[in-house]
């Protein structure tokens, strides 16, 4: 990677424009939204549909695309890695993960690291990740000076962690009064839990896929969910 260090954010941004670095891409090169959708649709087809017998049957499909969090305030982190300690100022939603990240990058123990949680602004879950913390730590460790990393809106949009693409199918049986008697649904989307908490990778579905699925619906006699995580 490339880091441009200057005495102002503007100077750093202009210097990076002059460098105009080009990156070939990693192991996801060639991956497109179309290919991802094809995989999810295939998984959904594997689940199949449940036959619903009722006076009226609604059979619908919904799809939401990958969505950027678009934090209202720039992604930023200030880090100062010294010879025997580290101090971090960061708007984070996950202090323990930030601590683990700092320990991994610096090699320091927990008692050698101090984290100041600043005001978050509009985080929307994006600041649960620590990639921007890693950047500040690596540069500060190299320079042995305090460094503030600030992402431009363009960088934030290109390199964010996106809310997942999801495809859902519903079959709802209604009586002659229009009240639901049977609710069947199939959902296919990436398993965020396995990504965010690798130790939970053994779980072949993400309960967060359908939060309402954990609740009972006393007004609907029959309801059934099928989830396929990718």
Ranges and model annotations:
Residues 1-230:
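Structural alpha/beta core scaffold segments of enzyme domains
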